[in-house]
Structure formats: C-alpha cells, structure tokens
UniProtKB/Swiss-Prot annotation:
Keywords: Membrane, Transmembrane, Transmembrane helix, Transport
Protein name: Protein DETOXIFICATION 24
GO molecular function, one term: antiporter activity
Pfam families associated with the record: MatE (PF01554)
Location(s), subcellular: Membrane
Disordered: annotated segments: 1-20
GO biological process: xenobiotic detoxification by transmembrane export across the plasma membrane
GO cellular component: membrane
Transmembrane domains' residue ranges: 48-67, 72-92, 124-144, 160-180, 188-208, 225-245, 266-286, 298-318, 342-362, 384-404, 411-431, 441-461
Domain of life: Eukaryota
Family: Belongs to the multi antimicrobial extrusion (MATE) (TC 2.A.66.1) family.
Amino acid sequence: MSTQEEMEERLLREGSDAEGQSNNRESIYLRTKVWSEVNKMWRIALPSSLFRMTSFGSIIVAQAFIGHSSELGLAAYALLQSTFIRFLYGLMGGMSSATETLCGQAYGAEQYHTMGIYLQRSWIVDMAVTTLFLPFIVLAGPILRLLGQNVEITKTVDEIYPWMIPYVYSLIFTMTIQMYLQAQMRNAIVGVLSTLSLALDLVVTWWCVSVMGMGIGGALLGLNVGSWAMVLAEFVYIFGGWCPFTWTGFSIAAFVDLIPMLKLSISSGFMICLEYWYMSILVLMAGYTKDAKIAISAFSICQYIYTWELNICLGFLGAACVRVANELGKGDAHAVRFSIKVILTISTLMGVIFSALCLAFCGRISYLFSNSDEVSDAVNDLSVILAVSILLNSIQPILSGVAVGAGMQSIVAVVNLASYYAIGIPLGLILTYVFHLGVKGLWSGMLAGIAIQTIILCYIIYKTDWELEVKRTCERMKVWSLKPSNEESNPIIREESRSK
C-alpha cells in the first residue's frame, strides 16, 4: 500500500470516528434534554395529581361517613354534590387555570413581581363570581323540588347546604394558590399540605361522627376543617416569606385590569365546567334506561374509576400548562414544541398501562363498591369502553393544558361545547333509545365526543404558530406588566436577577 493510500485510509477512519463521536454527543445531549424535561414535568404533575386526588378523597370521606349515619342524608349529599357543588367546583377549577396561564407566562418572562398581583386579582374575580352563584346553593332544595326530585331528599338538602358554603369559598384560595405555586415549581408543598389536610379531615370527621355522634353535621364539619386548614397553611407559606420573589405584599394594583382577568377566568371556567358536567349528565340519563338501578350503579362505579384516573391526568394537564406558559414567557418556541412531545409521550404510555389494567381487573374492582354480581357483570361489560375512554383521557387533558398555557381557553371551550353537547350527548341518546344499547350506548356517545374533541385539539395545536404565540405572550406581558417600585432596593430580587 502506497503512502498516499495509507493517508487516505487514516483520514477516512478519523472522519468516521469524528462522525461517531458527534452522533454520540448528540445522543447524550438528547437524552439529557429529555430527562431534564421529564424531571420538570414530574415536579409539577405529581404534586398536582396528589392535590386533586386528596381533594376528591375529602369528598369521599364525607360521603362515606354520611352514608353510615343516614341513607337519606347520603342521598341528599350526593344530589347536592353532583349538581350545584360539582358545578361550582368545576367553575373554580376552570377559573383558576387563568391564574395558571398568567403566572406561568410571567414566571417564564421573569416578571416575578406580577405573579402576586395576578393571584390577588384572581381572588377578587373568583370571590365575586362565587358570591354571584351563591343563591343557587341557598335555593338548591326548592330548585331541585321544582325539577321533580324527591321532596324528602330535597328537604334534607335544605339542612345540608349551609355547611357547604364555607367549603365552596375555601376552593377559591386552594385552587388559585395551587396554580400560583405550580407556575413557579413550588407545588411540592401543595402535595404535602393536601395530604395532611386529608388526614386531618379524616380524624376530625371520625371524632365528630363516631365519638361525638354529630351525624351529617359532623361529617361536613370535618370537610370544612380540613379544607380551611389547608388554606391557612398556604397563607403561612406565602406570607411567611417562602415566596420572596413573587409575593411582595398586598397591592392596590390588584384592582386594576380586572375585566381582562374576568374574561379569561370565565372562558377558563366555562371550558372546565363543560367537562365536569358531562359525566354528571350521563349519570342522570342512565336513570331513565331499562334496569335503571343496575345501570346507575354500574355507571357510577365506572365514573369513580374514570375520575381517579382523570385526577392523575389533570396533573399532567397542569404540567403541560406550566411548561408551555413558562417557555412562551421565555420566548422559546422550540422548547414549547419539545415539552409538548415529551409530556404527550409519557402521558400516552401511562394511558396504555391504565387501559390494560382496566381490561384485566375492571370486573373485580366493582366488588369494592358493590356485592352484586349483576352490577359486576354490567361493569365488566363496560370495561372495553372504559379502557378506551381512559386511553383518550391520557391525551385530551394534555392538549387542553397546552391550550391553557397558551391562553386559548375560549377556543377549547367552544370545542368542548361542540364535541360534548352537540355530538356526544345526542349520539348517546340515539344509541340508547333508538338502537336500545342502554348504558353502553350512552358511554359510546360520550366516547365519540371525547374522540372528536381530541382530534380537533390535535389539529389546532399542530397548526399553531408557536413563534407567533411567543410574540403575543410578550405583548400581553408588556400590557399587563407592572414595574416593581422596589426592584432596585430589594436585594432578593437583585440576587435572583444575577442568578438568571
């Protein structure tokens, strides 16, 4: 071999080695980037899911103790909870997502001082809206009687509703504070506090009902004690100096620009309410099918399974919202796309796992709620539809979270309205009463609505110009931003700026 050939061969080997090293570096960089994104996602999603599951657990604790105290009380509590309280819970959850959008984008844009202002504005707006809807809770009994509900049950509702008013007002603070802390990656404390509040709720409820014999009032007292204990603990955390960059005290600026905040909050609340009420309407419709008792029992059990899984997925919704809002605030459209891909992949994989578990154990799980073999068979018959619903449920909330993070609540609300109520429910009615498919027909209609909603949201997000969304976010931050009067004199803020 000539010297020239040896040199060419050596150069080829060196080029190949360099290319291999470059590919290896790119692979390591990608793995590091994915792991970093997954870590950020779980830091948000895990405490958020825990908060939602413990909040739902508080409702279950009250229901369980009331059920052991009075069957009539259980029926009244379930009726009030599944109608007016569920509506307000969905409304507060939706309106608080406006706080999540604004605080997330402000945190990404490093406008930390505005986050506390947004939180205060959300308290004002949510308090006003809750007070506006309060007469519906006060008049829940008469309204339900006008709708033809059992008189004896609705009279018990009249005795229960005063206990629910403090609980509803506690939601204003717990939900908005959760979004505020979540936007700045401090929501681990929310998971801890929500777990402790559930434990306190359980202890107080047990003491009031089992030891003091307070019955329904004792169960609802425990619910309020647990809820407000969490609110007070969150106040201590925020006001006590654990959020030095984002909470600088109460400000008169909170009363400025309330109309834009109200518009965003209402569109957010409308978006979530449509989803919360969808399942409730289907449960009510199940009562008019053949073998209504079995149908309602089976559908309710499936609803419990669906709701537990939904609470986990809503944690991913929060993660998607915060990550998208943060990166939009930073002005990084590429990072937005990357975050969406990672969160969607993880959530879909979890959906596949949950769906498989549902298919394998759904019939057995039903025995946790009922000893009836007929109910178990009915639940097992619905397991395939439930599994598909769970799979779609692992995708749709992420897409909604992305839309919320970008401030597209109004668009999602319209999509939800069209998918659920213009397509899903009418189709379910046709399958039930025309084709006589019973509960399976109802759920199939719901499934069609969710599938259509998912497809539309996928298309909207796929076609979204994220560079344009970055510009819109920057413009929104300029319009809504407030210059901190003490920025130059505040060593904490100066230190935060240097670290960035």
